[in-house]
């Protein structure tokens, strides 16, 4: 290979909600960019993660999970974001979960069959499959569904075979100049990443009670004289009862969320962070396309 040659391309990571797409992206990048939680629908924006290694630059688009339910405006916009990611990439990584196959997986597969980009099938969470004897027949079933570029059993959680996927990606990057400087890991702003970190902590500490009805707006993000950042985050919920839930008994819950979010921000921004959080009720935001636009849910569509 000539020293002057460089390779660069876009790769979409797609799949139904909660199959481990964000965890896989974070593992491919070697650090945390996309938020992860056990709750479906934690990814709401298309996050671009960038991995540069020598002559190779892979630009990953982490899509919201494609899913069948489209009644709420936020679900329609998330599906639109995921579908548009599939259309303009060099390669697709389709993530499925162990030996599970659902109508949502089928829907994603149908969209991929219509596309031109080659597809790597990442069968995630294989380490969690109880009946190992079921795995091979299931892989054979998957192989019969479409002409995949490759089928790779992986564990995004432990990192098993993630390097194999990275190697396949490198091999299929077209010759092109790099889009981003070598040290870039995402094209998202620090302000955006701060809101994602807070949202992850909300998802993590509030259990199943708040599936979509919480979002975060960063009202203030400024450098301070101590070489760090002062950040004010506004947590928006849909009902008064949810506000009480976020605040917790004598403010205990929001305090925990703030402490954990600040730790992650300091690690990501490599600087001290002073974080203040407020909670406000804004009813119906997840059903209101105008509200969603103002909160940045359609900034890249």
UniProtKB/Swiss-Prot annotation:
What residue spans carry the region label G2? 41-45
Q: Where is the signal peptide?
A: none
Q: Where does GTP bind?
A: 15-22, 62-66, 124-127
Single Gene Ontology MF annotation: small ribosomal subunit rRNA binding
Q: Please give the CDD domains that the UniProt record associates with this protein.
A: Era, KH-II_Era
Q: Where is this region: G5?
A: 154-156
One Gene Ontology cellular component: cytosol
**What are the boundaries of the region G1?**
15-22
G4: region residues? 124-127
Record Pfam families = KH_2, MMR_HSR1
Top-rank taxon: Bacteria
Gene3D superfamilies reported for this sequence: 3.30.300.20, P-loop containing nucleotide triphosphate hydrolases
Q: How does it sit in the membrane?
A: Peripheral membrane protein
Q: Which residues form the KH type-2 domain?
A: 206-283
Q: Which InterPro entries match?
A: G_ERA_dom, GTP-bd, GTPase_Era-like, KH_dom-like_a/b, KH_dom_type_2, KH_sf_prok-type, P-loop_NTPase, Small_GTP-bd
Indicate the segments forming the Era-type G domain, all copies.
7-175
UniProt keyword terms in alphabetical order: Cell inner membrane, Cell membrane, Cytoplasm, GTP-binding, Membrane, Nucleotide-binding, Ribosome biogenesis, RNA-binding, rRNA-binding
- Subcellular localization(s) per the UniProt record: Cytoplasm; Cell inner membrane
Chain residue ranges for the region called G3? 62-65
| Major location (coarse) | cytoplasm
Assembly, in brief, is: Monomer.
Protein role: An essential GTPase that binds both GDP and GTP, with rapid nucleotide exchange. Plays a role in 16S rRNA processing and 30S ribosomal subunit biogenesis and possibly also in cell cycle regulation and energy metabolism.
The record's family statement is: Belongs to the TRAFAC class TrmE-Era-EngA-EngB-Septin-like GTPase superfamily. Era GTPase family.
Q: What is this protein called?
A: GTPase Era
Q: Which organism is it from?
A: Citrobacter koseri (strain ATCC BAA-895 / CDC 4225-83 / SGSC4696)
């Amino acid at each position: 290979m000539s020293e002057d040659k460089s390779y660069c391309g876009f790769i979409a990571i797609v799949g139904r909600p909660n199959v481990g797409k964000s965890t896989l992206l974070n593992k491919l990048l070697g650090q945390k960019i996309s938020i992860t939680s056990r709750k479906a629908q934690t990814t709401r924006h298309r996050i671009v993660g960038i991995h540069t290694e020598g002559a190779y630059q892979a630009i990953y688009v982490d899509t919201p999970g494609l899913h069948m339910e489209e009644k709420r405006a936020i679900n329609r916009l998330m599906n639109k974001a995921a579908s548009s990611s599939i259309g303009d990439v060099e390669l697709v990584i389709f993530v499925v979960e162990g030996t599970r196959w659902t109508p949502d997986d089928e829907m994603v597969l149908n969209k991929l069959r219509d596309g031109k980009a080659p597809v790597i099938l990442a069968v995630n969470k294989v380490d969690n499959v109880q009946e190992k004897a079921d795995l091979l027949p299931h892989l054979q079933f998957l192989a019969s569904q479409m002409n995949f570029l490759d089928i790779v059993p992986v564990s995004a959680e432990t990192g098993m075979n993630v390097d194999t996927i990275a190697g396949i990606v490198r091999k299929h990057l077209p010759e092109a100049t790099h889009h981003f400087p070598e040290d870039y890991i995402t094209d998202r702003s620090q302000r955006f990443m701060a809101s994602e970190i807070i949202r992850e902590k909300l998802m993590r500490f509030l259990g199943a009670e708040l599936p979509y009805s919480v979002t975060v707006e960063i009202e203030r993000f400024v450098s301070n004289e101590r070489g760090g950042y002062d950040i004010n985050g506004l947590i928006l919920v849909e009902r008064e009862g949810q506000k009480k839930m976020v605040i917790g008994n004598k403010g205990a819950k929001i305090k925990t969320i703030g402490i954990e979010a600040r730790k992650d921000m300091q690690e990501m921004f490599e600087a001290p962070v002073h974080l203040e959080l407020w909670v406000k009720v804004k009813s119906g935001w997840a059903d209101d396309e105008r509200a969603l636009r103002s909160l940045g849910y359609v900034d890249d569509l």
